[in-house]
A protein has these predicted regions:
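Terminal, non-globular segments
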Residues: 1-154
């Protein structure tokens, strides 16, 4: 994937996430399109560019997030590193495997974020956390299949 294409994909997905995705919430949970873009870049772009895109996408999401500042910047970069390492070790040749990887990463992002919030003294109810973690990861994985279809990734 060319550099400008990866940047454009992440930018378009971020704009969609901040504007239109609010209208397709399921149980007040919406997919993380920016994370889909970061993982797609980590899967298909060269290593340095994918890491830079992960860092920039995390910083972009942090500017509009109400969470602790910097959490997405750090974790999007780390997810990019892990996906780059995983693509060397595992066969991620079909969209089902990629969607499963995205679902797992979104679930881990929710778990790590909750642990950080608990450490910072910000309580998150268990029911809200479970709904966000389970439904959010499944919803994001399903939406990633649609994103791959639109991008014509096979």
């Amino acid at each position: 994937m060319k550099r400008w294409v990866g940047s454009l994909i992440i930018l378009v997905l971020f704009i969609l996430q901040t504007t239109l995705v609010d209208y397709i919430k399921i149980f007040n949970t919406k997919p993380d399109l920016t994370l889909i873009g970061v993982i797609t870049a980590a899967l298909f772009c060269d290593q340095k560019w994918a890491l830079l895109l992960g860092l920039c996408a995390g910083a972009l999401k942090d500017t509009f997030a109400t969470q602790a500042l910097g959490i997405n910047t750090v974790f999007f970069f780390l997810w990019s590193v892990l996906v780059i390492k995983a693509r060397r070790r595992f066969s991620l040749d079909f969209n089902g495997a990629r969607a499963l990887l995205i679902g797992i990463i979104v679930f881990l992002q929710a778990v790590v974020t909750r642990v950080i919030f608990l450490y910072l003294g910000i309580p998150v109810a268990l029911g809200i956390f479970l709904r966000t973690a389970i439904l959010g990861s499944a919803y994001t994985a399903l939406v990633s299949l649609a994103v791959f279809k639109v991008l014509r990734i096979k």
